[in-house]
Amino acid sequence: MSGHPGPFPSVSSVLPHRPPFLFIDRVVELSEDRVVAVRTFQADESFFLGHFPERPVVPGVVLIEGLAQAMAYHSLLHHPSRQILLVGIDQARFRSTIGPGTEVTFEVHVGEQRFGLTKGRGEVRSLTQPIASATLLGYAAEPHGNPSIPGGTR
């Protein structure tokens, strides 16, 4: 992997997600410990119909999922035969709202990786304005069956 701008493999060739639940358009930077992805939220996104019709706002859960998908992209390049599961979200903060037509970056600094678990600290930005941030925990599970997550309560 390179610390320089791409081109990188397409998002759809790495992630199993598909529209309408794919929230990153492309990866623009990638290194051993960092990934930056971009998404432009279009006016016809289905969630804008109900969130909120008079003043459409991208739901916070969509922003967190975008961070998780960026981290999953990074993890799947290291573990291509695994299924990456989001198993934890900590310190989620929402600083501003965004609406249709907004381009955001999802930047995740990938940290500690042990026992199939990956911890990442992510930030969503529009231009230079911080929108949201969170610490994420992902797990590289076997692709079939019911995963047992280390430290989980299943």
Segments and roles (model prediction):
Residues 1-9:
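Single-stranded RNA-binding regions, centering on S1/OB-family and related RNA-binding modules
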Residues 2-3, 32-36, 98-102, 109-154:
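HotDog/MaoC-like acyl-thioester-processing domains
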Residues 8-18, 80:
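Short aromatic-glycine motifs in intrinsically disordered, low-complexity regions
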Residues 18-58:
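Catalytic strand-loop segment that frames the active site of acyl-thioester-processing enzymes
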Residues 49-73, 86:
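Compact, glycine-rich, soluble single-domain proteins
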